[in-house]
Amino acid sequence: MADVFEVQDEIARKIAEALRIKITPQEKEALAVKPTESLQAYDHYLRGRSYARRLTRQDLDFSLQMFSDAVALDPEFALAHAAIANVCAYFFCHYDREPSWIDRARAASEKAVALRPDVPEVMVAQAWILYSRGEYLDAARILRSVISRKRDCEGAFYLLLRCLFASGQYQEVAGLAEEAIEASGTDYNVYVPILNSLGALAKTESRNNIMQRAIQAHEAHLREVPEDARSRSLLAGCYADMGRPEDSKREATMAMTLRPNESSILYNAACTFCSLNEKADALDALAKAWRAGFKDSDWARGDPDLALLHGEPEFERLYPTKA
Protein backbone atom coordinates (compact mmCIF):
# COMPACT_ATOMS: atom_id res chain seq x y z
CA MET A 1 0.00 0.00 0.00
CA ALA A 2 2.85 2.39 0.72
CA ASP A 3 3.85 2.37 -2.95
CA VAL A 4 0.36 2.92 -4.41
CA PHE A 5 1.21 6.29 -5.94
CA GLU A 6 4.46 4.95 -7.39
CA VAL A 7 2.48 2.11 -8.97
CA GLN A 8 -0.05 4.56 -10.43
CA ASP A 9 2.80 6.65 -11.83
CA GLU A 10 4.45 3.62 -13.41
CA ILE A 11 1.16 2.41 -14.92
CA ALA A 12 0.49 5.82 -16.46
CA ARG A 13 3.96 5.91 -17.98
CA LYS A 14 3.69 2.36 -19.35
CA ILE A 15 0.33 3.12 -20.97
CA ALA A 16 1.71 6.25 -22.58
CA GLU A 17 4.69 4.30 -23.92
CA ALA A 18 2.51 1.46 -25.22
CA LEU A 19 0.24 3.87 -27.06
CA ARG A 20 3.20 5.95 -28.22
CA ILE A 21 1.68 9.03 -26.64
CA LYS A 22 3.96 12.04 -26.42
CA ILE A 23 3.77 13.35 -22.85
CA THR A 24 4.20 17.08 -22.43
CA PRO A 25 6.56 18.49 -19.79
CA GLN A 26 3.51 19.61 -17.78
CA GLU A 27 2.04 16.09 -17.91
CA LYS A 28 5.36 14.58 -16.84
CA GLU A 29 5.42 16.95 -13.89
CA ALA A 30 1.83 16.02 -12.98
CA LEU A 31 2.66 12.31 -13.06
CA ALA A 32 5.60 12.87 -10.75
CA VAL A 33 3.62 14.75 -8.09
CA LYS A 34 1.75 12.74 -5.47
CA PRO A 35 -1.64 14.24 -4.54
CA THR A 36 -0.95 13.51 -0.85
CA GLU A 37 1.50 11.59 1.31
CA SER A 38 -1.39 10.14 3.33
CA LEU A 39 -3.07 7.04 1.94
CA GLN A 40 -5.86 7.46 4.47
CA ALA A 41 -6.49 11.02 3.28
CA TYR A 42 -6.55 9.81 -0.32
CA ASP A 43 -9.03 7.08 0.58
CA HIS A 44 -11.34 9.67 2.16
CA TYR A 45 -10.96 11.84 -0.94
CA LEU A 46 -11.96 9.04 -3.30
CA ARG A 47 -14.95 8.12 -1.15
CA GLY A 48 -16.00 11.76 -1.07
CA ARG A 49 -15.73 12.04 -4.83
CA SER A 50 -18.02 9.02 -5.25
CA TYR A 51 -20.67 10.63 -3.03
CA ALA A 52 -20.25 14.04 -4.69
CA ARG A 53 -21.17 12.69 -8.12
CA ARG A 54 -24.66 11.82 -6.88
CA LEU A 55 -25.41 15.52 -6.20
CA THR A 56 -28.24 14.99 -3.70
CA ARG A 57 -28.09 16.98 -0.49
CA GLN A 58 -27.50 13.96 1.72
CA ASP A 59 -24.79 12.59 -0.55
CA LEU A 60 -23.13 16.01 -0.70
CA ASP A 61 -23.21 16.11 3.11
CA PHE A 62 -21.41 12.76 3.12
CA SER A 63 -18.89 13.97 0.54
CA LEU A 64 -18.19 17.16 2.47
CA GLN A 65 -17.45 15.09 5.57
CA MET A 66 -15.09 12.85 3.60
CA PHE A 67 -13.23 15.79 2.06
CA SER A 68 -13.03 17.57 5.43
CA ASP A 69 -11.56 14.43 6.99
CA ALA A 70 -9.04 14.28 4.14
CA VAL A 71 -7.74 17.82 4.76
CA ALA A 72 -7.68 17.17 8.50
CA LEU A 73 -5.36 14.24 7.81
CA ASP A 74 -3.30 16.26 5.32
CA PRO A 75 -3.81 20.05 5.43
CA GLU A 76 -1.71 20.38 2.25
CA PHE A 77 -3.98 18.10 0.18
CA ALA A 78 -4.93 20.60 -2.55
CA LEU A 79 -7.36 18.31 -4.39
CA ALA A 80 -9.41 17.82 -1.24
CA HIS A 81 -9.55 21.58 -0.58
CA ALA A 82 -10.70 22.07 -4.19
CA ALA A 83 -13.35 19.37 -3.76
CA ILE A 84 -14.70 21.18 -0.68
CA ALA A 85 -14.99 24.35 -2.79
CA ASN A 86 -16.91 22.45 -5.48
CA VAL A 87 -19.39 20.99 -3.01
CA CYS A 88 -19.98 24.30 -1.22
CA ALA A 89 -20.60 26.11 -4.51
CA TYR A 90 -23.04 23.40 -5.59
CA PHE A 91 -24.85 23.68 -2.25
CA PHE A 92 -25.27 27.39 -2.88
CA CYS A 93 -26.60 26.86 -6.41
CA HIS A 94 -29.15 24.18 -5.60
CA TYR A 95 -29.90 23.90 -1.92
CA ASP A 96 -29.18 26.95 0.17
CA ARG A 97 -28.59 30.51 -1.03
CA GLU A 98 -26.85 31.48 2.19
CA PRO A 99 -23.74 33.56 1.34
CA SER A 100 -21.80 31.51 3.88
CA TRP A 101 -21.64 28.65 1.35
CA ILE A 102 -19.87 30.86 -1.18
CA ASP A 103 -17.61 32.25 1.54
CA ARG A 104 -16.66 28.71 2.46
CA ALA A 105 -16.18 27.74 -1.19
CA ARG A 106 -13.94 30.74 -1.77
CA ALA A 107 -11.86 30.02 1.33
CA ALA A 108 -11.33 26.39 0.30
CA SER A 109 -10.51 27.42 -3.26
CA GLU A 110 -7.95 29.95 -2.04
CA LYS A 111 -6.27 27.25 0.06
CA ALA A 112 -6.14 24.95 -2.96
CA VAL A 113 -4.73 27.71 -5.17
CA ALA A 114 -2.08 28.58 -2.59
CA LEU A 115 -0.97 24.94 -2.52
CA ARG A 116 -1.24 23.94 -6.20
CA PRO A 117 -2.39 26.86 -8.40
CA ASP A 118 -1.97 25.08 -11.74
CA VAL A 119 -3.63 21.76 -10.91
CA PRO A 120 -6.71 21.27 -13.16
CA GLU A 121 -8.99 20.19 -10.30
CA VAL A 122 -8.14 23.39 -8.45
CA MET A 123 -9.13 25.42 -11.52
CA VAL A 124 -12.46 23.56 -11.67
CA ALA A 125 -13.15 24.75 -8.13
CA GLN A 126 -12.57 28.34 -9.25
CA ALA A 127 -14.97 27.77 -12.15
CA TRP A 128 -17.70 26.47 -9.80
CA ILE A 129 -17.52 29.69 -7.81
CA LEU A 130 -17.89 31.75 -10.99
CA TYR A 131 -20.80 29.54 -12.09
CA SER A 132 -22.54 30.06 -8.75
CA ARG A 133 -22.42 33.82 -9.40
CA GLY A 134 -23.88 33.44 -12.89
CA GLU A 135 -20.57 34.26 -14.58
CA TYR A 136 -20.96 31.42 -17.07
CA LEU A 137 -18.64 32.64 -19.81
CA ASP A 138 -15.76 33.30 -17.43
CA ALA A 139 -16.25 29.87 -15.87
CA ALA A 140 -16.35 28.26 -19.32
CA ARG A 141 -13.08 29.95 -20.26
CA ILE A 142 -11.34 28.38 -17.26
CA LEU A 143 -12.87 24.98 -17.96
CA ARG A 144 -11.71 24.97 -21.58
CA SER A 145 -8.20 25.57 -20.31
CA VAL A 146 -8.60 22.69 -17.85
CA ILE A 147 -9.84 20.30 -20.53
CA SER A 148 -7.02 21.25 -22.90
CA ARG A 149 -4.61 20.06 -20.22
CA LYS A 150 -6.54 17.14 -18.73
CA ARG A 151 -9.55 15.94 -20.71
CA ASP A 152 -10.77 13.56 -18.01
CA CYS A 153 -10.47 16.02 -15.13
CA GLU A 154 -13.22 15.20 -12.62
CA GLY A 155 -16.36 17.24 -13.35
CA ALA A 156 -14.74 19.57 -15.90
CA PHE A 157 -16.85 18.63 -18.92
CA TYR A 158 -20.03 18.45 -16.85
CA LEU A 159 -19.58 21.98 -15.54
CA LEU A 160 -18.51 23.32 -18.94
CA LEU A 161 -21.68 21.93 -20.53
CA ARG A 162 -23.75 23.37 -17.69
CA CYS A 163 -22.20 26.79 -18.31
CA LEU A 164 -22.90 26.59 -22.04
CA PHE A 165 -26.46 25.38 -21.50
CA ALA A 166 -27.22 28.09 -18.93
CA SER A 167 -25.97 30.74 -21.36
CA GLY A 168 -28.08 29.36 -24.22
CA GLN A 169 -25.23 27.89 -26.27
CA TYR A 170 -27.08 24.69 -27.08
CA GLN A 171 -25.37 24.00 -30.40
CA GLU A 172 -21.97 24.18 -28.75
CA VAL A 173 -23.08 21.64 -26.14
CA ALA A 174 -24.26 19.34 -28.92
CA GLY A 175 -20.93 19.70 -30.69
CA LEU A 176 -19.03 18.66 -27.58
CA ALA A 177 -21.29 15.72 -26.72
CA GLU A 178 -19.17 12.83 -27.98
CA GLU A 179 -15.93 14.19 -26.55
CA ALA A 180 -17.59 14.90 -23.21
CA ILE A 181 -19.13 11.43 -22.90
CA GLU A 182 -15.85 9.74 -23.78
CA ALA A 183 -13.80 11.87 -21.37
CA SER A 184 -16.27 11.62 -18.48
CA GLY A 185 -16.15 7.85 -18.17
CA THR A 186 -18.69 6.57 -15.65
CA ASP A 187 -19.90 10.04 -14.60
CA TYR A 188 -23.50 9.91 -15.84
CA ASN A 189 -24.12 13.58 -14.98
CA VAL A 190 -22.61 14.67 -18.27
CA TYR A 191 -25.65 13.34 -20.16
CA VAL A 192 -28.01 15.87 -18.53
CA PRO A 193 -26.94 19.12 -20.26
CA ILE A 194 -26.41 17.22 -23.51
CA LEU A 195 -29.95 15.84 -23.55
CA ASN A 196 -31.38 19.20 -22.52
CA SER A 197 -29.51 21.00 -25.29
CA LEU A 198 -30.53 18.51 -27.96
CA GLY A 199 -34.12 18.90 -26.78
CA ALA A 200 -33.88 22.68 -27.01
CA LEU A 201 -32.51 22.31 -30.56
CA ALA A 202 -35.35 19.88 -31.45
CA LYS A 203 -32.77 17.33 -32.62
CA THR A 204 -35.02 14.36 -31.90
CA GLU A 205 -32.99 11.62 -33.58
CA SER A 206 -29.72 12.68 -31.96
CA ARG A 207 -31.43 13.07 -28.61
CA ASN A 208 -32.95 9.59 -28.80
CA ASN A 209 -29.53 8.13 -29.62
CA ILE A 210 -27.92 9.84 -26.63
CA MET A 211 -30.91 8.86 -24.49
CA GLN A 212 -30.37 5.18 -25.23
CA ARG A 213 -26.72 5.52 -24.26
CA ALA A 214 -27.70 7.32 -21.07
CA ILE A 215 -30.11 4.49 -20.20
CA GLN A 216 -27.34 1.95 -20.67
CA ALA A 217 -25.00 4.04 -18.50
CA HIS A 218 -27.56 4.35 -15.70
CA GLU A 219 -28.55 0.68 -15.79
CA ALA A 220 -24.89 -0.38 -15.63
CA HIS A 221 -24.21 2.06 -12.79
CA LEU A 222 -27.23 0.95 -10.76
CA ARG A 223 -26.16 -2.67 -10.95
CA GLU A 224 -23.09 -1.54 -9.00
CA VAL A 225 -24.65 1.23 -6.86
CA PRO A 226 -28.40 0.45 -6.47
CA GLU A 227 -28.87 3.08 -3.74
CA ASP A 228 -28.01 6.00 -6.06
CA ALA A 229 -31.28 7.95 -6.01
CA ARG A 230 -30.12 10.56 -8.53
CA SER A 231 -29.26 7.95 -11.11
CA ARG A 232 -32.68 6.33 -10.61
CA SER A 233 -34.45 9.68 -10.98
CA LEU A 234 -32.59 10.47 -14.20
CA LEU A 235 -33.27 6.96 -15.50
CA ALA A 236 -36.97 7.50 -14.78
CA GLY A 237 -36.92 10.54 -17.05
CA CYS A 238 -35.15 8.62 -19.79
CA TYR A 239 -37.68 5.79 -19.62
CA ALA A 240 -40.55 8.29 -19.81
CA ASP A 241 -39.10 9.89 -22.93
CA MET A 242 -38.59 6.51 -24.58
CA GLY A 243 -42.21 5.42 -24.06
CA ARG A 244 -41.72 3.16 -21.04
CA PRO A 245 -44.16 4.73 -18.53
CA GLU A 246 -44.31 1.83 -16.07
CA ASP A 247 -40.53 1.57 -15.85
CA SER A 248 -40.41 5.34 -15.48
CA LYS A 249 -42.87 5.44 -12.58
CA ARG A 250 -41.08 2.56 -10.86
CA GLU A 251 -37.72 4.34 -10.93
CA ALA A 252 -39.19 7.72 -9.96
CA THR A 253 -40.99 6.16 -7.01
CA MET A 254 -37.84 4.36 -5.89
CA ALA A 255 -35.81 7.57 -6.16
CA MET A 256 -38.31 9.57 -4.08
CA THR A 257 -38.44 6.75 -1.53
CA LEU A 258 -34.66 6.82 -1.19
CA ARG A 259 -34.50 10.64 -0.95
CA PRO A 260 -38.02 12.03 -0.16
CA ASN A 261 -36.90 15.60 0.59
CA GLU A 262 -34.21 16.09 -2.04
CA SER A 263 -34.76 19.07 -4.34
CA SER A 264 -32.86 17.50 -7.24
CA ILE A 265 -34.88 14.28 -6.99
CA LEU A 266 -38.13 16.25 -6.87
CA TYR A 267 -37.02 18.42 -9.79
CA ASN A 268 -36.25 15.35 -11.88
CA ALA A 269 -39.61 13.86 -10.88
CA ALA A 270 -41.27 17.02 -12.21
CA CYS A 271 -39.45 16.52 -15.51
CA THR A 272 -40.59 12.91 -15.61
CA PHE A 273 -44.23 13.82 -14.94
CA CYS A 274 -44.05 16.40 -17.73
CA SER A 275 -42.84 13.71 -20.11
CA LEU A 276 -45.82 11.60 -19.04
CA ASN A 277 -48.11 14.62 -19.62
CA GLU A 278 -49.15 14.75 -15.96
CA LYS A 279 -49.11 18.52 -15.44
CA ALA A 280 -50.61 18.68 -11.94
CA ASP A 281 -48.15 16.14 -10.55
CA ALA A 282 -45.30 17.93 -12.32
CA LEU A 283 -46.22 21.31 -10.81
CA ASP A 284 -46.58 19.76 -7.38
CA ALA A 285 -43.16 18.10 -7.59
CA LEU A 286 -41.54 21.28 -8.92
CA ALA A 287 -43.02 23.40 -6.12
CA LYS A 288 -41.62 20.91 -3.61
CA ALA A 289 -38.25 21.09 -5.35
CA TRP A 290 -38.29 24.89 -5.05
CA ARG A 291 -39.17 24.73 -1.36
CA ALA A 292 -36.38 22.19 -0.87
CA GLY A 293 -33.87 24.59 -2.41
CA PHE A 294 -33.79 24.31 -6.22
CA LYS A 295 -34.15 27.95 -7.31
CA ASP A 296 -32.03 28.14 -10.48
CA SER A 297 -34.29 30.05 -12.89
CA ASP A 298 -31.81 29.93 -15.79
CA TRP A 299 -31.72 26.16 -15.65
CA ALA A 300 -35.44 25.58 -15.06
CA ARG A 301 -36.57 27.98 -17.79
CA GLY A 302 -34.10 26.55 -20.28
CA ASP A 303 -34.90 22.92 -19.53
CA PRO A 304 -37.04 21.55 -22.40
CA ASP A 305 -38.30 18.78 -20.11
CA LEU A 306 -40.36 21.44 -18.28
CA ALA A 307 -41.83 23.00 -21.43
CA LEU A 308 -45.29 21.69 -20.48
CA LEU A 309 -45.28 24.08 -17.51
CA HIS A 310 -44.25 27.25 -19.34
CA GLY A 311 -46.89 29.94 -18.91
CA GLU A 312 -48.40 28.29 -15.84
CA PRO A 313 -48.74 30.97 -13.12
CA GLU A 314 -47.10 28.77 -10.49
CA PHE A 315 -44.11 28.05 -12.73
CA GLU A 316 -43.68 31.73 -13.61
CA ARG A 317 -43.87 32.67 -9.93
CA LEU A 318 -41.28 30.14 -8.86
CA TYR A 319 -38.89 30.63 -11.76
CA PRO A 320 -39.34 34.17 -13.13
CA THR A 321 -37.41 35.57 -16.06
CA LYS A 322 -34.37 37.46 -14.84
CA ALA A 323 -34.39 41.20 -15.47
Describe the function of each predicted region.
Residues 120, 124, 130, 135-323:
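Alpha-helical protein-protein interaction modules
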Residues 1-191:
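Acidic, proline/glycine-rich low-complexity intrinsically disordered segments
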